[in-house]
Regions:
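Glycine-rich phosphate/pyrophosphate-binding loop at beta-loop-alpha junctions
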Residues: 1-40, 88-110
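Active-site-adjacent helical/loop segments in soluble small-molecule enzymes
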Residues: 31-89
Length: 110
């Protein structure tokens, strides 16, 4: 989506990184409808690394006692790694799902 926003149009990629833990976020294209919503309603896009997602996932499991799907850990990364400009009085909501959990795959990360 970052590349699509930069170019001003939905982009299609010939190849994608299929070695990511966030496989549900690794679409080879930005959908037209989603692109229009992002263009209109999203103020900023924060890119995250594989290592940050793995660490975020570990923290969610160990500290919050929840087991999200790996892609959901991407939502928690900006908070864990201070990538947001939040004051101590800020309120933040992170929506987390677990519909695509592969416990063997998660176990292999740690």
């Amino acid at each position: 989506m970052t590349n699509s926003i930069k170019s001003g149009k939905p982009e299609i990629f010939d190849t994608i990184n299929n070695k990511t833990i966030a496989d549900t976020l690794a679409a080879p294209f930005a959908g037209k409808i989603t692109f229009e919503y992002v263009k209109e309603y999203v103020d900023d896009i924060i890119n995250v690394s594989e290592d940050e997602m793995i660490e975020s996932l570990r923290m969610m499991i160990e500290r919050l006692k929840i087991v999200p799907e790996p892609s959901a850990s991407a939502c928690f990364v900006p908070i864990v790694f201070n990538k947001l400009n939040l004051s101590s009085k800020s309120k933040c909501l992170v929506v987390v799902c677990g519909g695509n959990i592969d416990l063997k795959r998660i176990k292999s990360l740690f």
